[in-house]
Swiss-Prot record:
This is Acetylglutamate kinase. Belongs to the acetylglutamate kinase family. ArgB subfamily. Keywords: Amino-acid biosynthesis, Arginine biosynthesis, ATP-binding, Cytoplasm, Kinase, Nucleotide-binding, Transferase. Substrate binds at G72, G73, R94, N196. GO terms for cellular component: cytoplasm. One of its GO terms (biological process) is L-arginine biosynthetic process. It comes from Burkholderia mallei (strain ATCC 23344). It is found in: Cytoplasm. The keyword Kinase applies. The lineage of its organism: Bacteria, Pseudomonadati, Pseudomonadota, Betaproteobacteria, Burkholderiales. It is an enzyme of class 2 (transferase). The keyword Cytoplasm applies. The record marks K37, K256 as: Transition state stabilizer.
């Protein structure tokens, strides 16, 4: 993991140079929407949490419209452990029974979301938290998980959903009023149930519906890695399919990369997987030309 930069040790001249280099990117993304999937260590380490909050505020101040979709897997696991439940995953998706869904709603829509909103507001931003149930934002349907061992069969993983439709009106209204939306990935179904939706999938769909200029997905690794542990900086759809096929991309990276690729194919101009363990990784990706993480291309 990269060591954090001590900004107090940077000379005024170098700080000015850094800002000058960011200017073309500020112009490029001014007035544009950037969807950020926020998760991993960046949500649990205090230094990284504060750095992320400041990054998001800076983006808003220079005229870029950040929309945050957050995860909270470790926090959910911790809450489940307190009530004696063990988290179970199939193909990177959390098996969610009724009791687990109650915990998910409490943790994501309450504890985690409010922590993010409070931190952004503490540093001078104006963040508003909402779940996919608020304002009819995310219509969900039950996810039918294909059984890899039995083609044509499906595995029931409970109240786990996929995005059926997104109504972006509430997000656009918040953006128009200069707020930063912070979204918990919980949707509502026509059956009246709440659904736990993978945050990567929500971020990808939301980026598409909002016509976002960029989708940034934060993770706990440098990006997509090959089997030897080398960073793959640029991946096409064909290359990604091959990595799925040979098992290089597996587990929790499956929904992340699938969502990133779908967003790229649906017209999101720039899609990147970045290392959230590096301080200011969001700014490095958006406001510099330094190659960072893995770029996902549709062709």
């Amino acid at each position: 993991m990269s060591e954090p930069i001590d900004l107090s040790q940077i000379s005024p001249a170098l700080k000015a140079e850094i800002l000058a280099e960011a200017l073309p990117y500020i112009r490029r993304y001014h007035g544009k929407t950037v969807v950020i999937k926020y998760g991993g260590n960046a949500m649990t380490e205090e230094r990284l949490k504060q750095g992320f909050a400041r990054d998001v505020i800076l983006l808003k101040l220079v005229g870029i419209n950040p929309v945050i979709v957050h995860g909270g897997g470790p926090q959910i696991d911790q809450a489940l452990k307190k009530i004696g439940k063990q988290g179970t995953f199939i193909q990177g998706m959390r098996v969610t029974d009724e009791e687990t869904m109650e915990v998910v709603e409490w943790v994501l829509g309450g504890e985690v979301q409010q922590d993010i909103v409070t931190l952004i507001n503490h540093f001078g931003g104006h963040a508003v938290g909402l779940t996919g149930k608020d304002g009819g934002l995310i219509h969900a349907r039950k996810l039918m998980m294909p059984d890899r061992d039995n083609p044509g069969e499906y595995v029931d993983i409970g109240q786990v959903g996929e995005v059926e439709a997104i109504n972006p009106a509430v997000v656009k209204a918040l953006q128009d009023d200069a707020f930063i939306p912070v979204i918990s990935p919980i949707g509502f179904g026509e059956d009246g149930l709440s659904y736990n939706i993978n945050a990567d999938l929500v971020a990808g769909k939301l980026a598409t519906v909002l016509n976002a200029e960029k989708l940034v997905m934060m993770t706990n690794i440098p990006g997509v890695m090959d089997k030897e542990g080398n960073l793959l900086t640029d991946l096409s759809a064909r290359e990604i399919d091959a990595l799925f096929e040979d098992g290089t991309i597996s587990g929790g990276m499956l929904p992340k990369i699938s969502s990133a690729l779908d967003a790229a194919k649906s017209g999101v101009k720039s899609v990147h997987i970045v290392d959230g363990r590096i301080e200011h990784s969001v700014l490095l990706e958006i406001l510099t030309e330094q190659p960072f993480g893995t770029m996902i291309r549709s062709h």
